[in-house]
């Protein structure tokens, strides 16, 4: 029953799938008005996402791309200041991407 409730809850959420074409250019990241230091964001991400270097098919069978985005977003909003997280973007490949905005 718990698994069915979780599956139904996730099924009602919206994920955006994007295909990306890329180009190469340069840009210097300099913004004294950043809302949060990038180092702090990295620390939060490492704490919330225990998925690094895992085989999601074998180690975490629950996940498909959209579910990974929902999992990360739900846990990141608990770590960050209110209304700071805009979206979570998962790159399956360079051209296949899932975007979750908490909707």
Swiss-Prot record:
Pathway annotation: Cofactor biosynthesis; tetrahydrobiopterin biosynthesis; tetrahydrobiopterin from 7,8-dihydroneopterin triphosphate: step 1/3
One GO term (biological process): tetrahydrobiopterin biosynthetic process
Modified residues (N-acetylalanine): 1
Function: Involved in the biosynthesis of tetrahydrobiopterin, an essential cofactor of aromatic amino acid hydroxylases. Catalyzes the transformation of 7,8-dihydroneopterin triphosphate into 6-pyruvoyl tetrahydropterin.
Keyword Acetylation: yes
Additional remark text: Two isoforms of this protein have been found. The active site is at the interface between 2 subunits. The proton acceptor Cys is on one subunit, and the charge relay system is on the other subunit.
Residue positions of the active site: 53 (charge relay system), 92 (charge relay system)
GO molecular function: 6-pyruvoyltetrahydropterin synthase activity; metal ion binding
Family from the record: Belongs to the PTPS family.
Pfam families: PTPS
Enzyme Commission code(s) on record: 4.2.3.12
Organism: Salmo salar (Atlantic salmon)
InterPro entries documented for this protein: 6-PTP_synth/QueD (IPR007115), 6-PTP_synth/QueD_sf (IPR038418), PTPS_His_AS (IPR022469)
Cofactor: Zn(2+)
Binding positions for Zn(2+) per the UniProt entry: 27
Keyword Iron: no
Descriptive protein name: 6-pyruvoyl tetrahydrobiopterin synthase
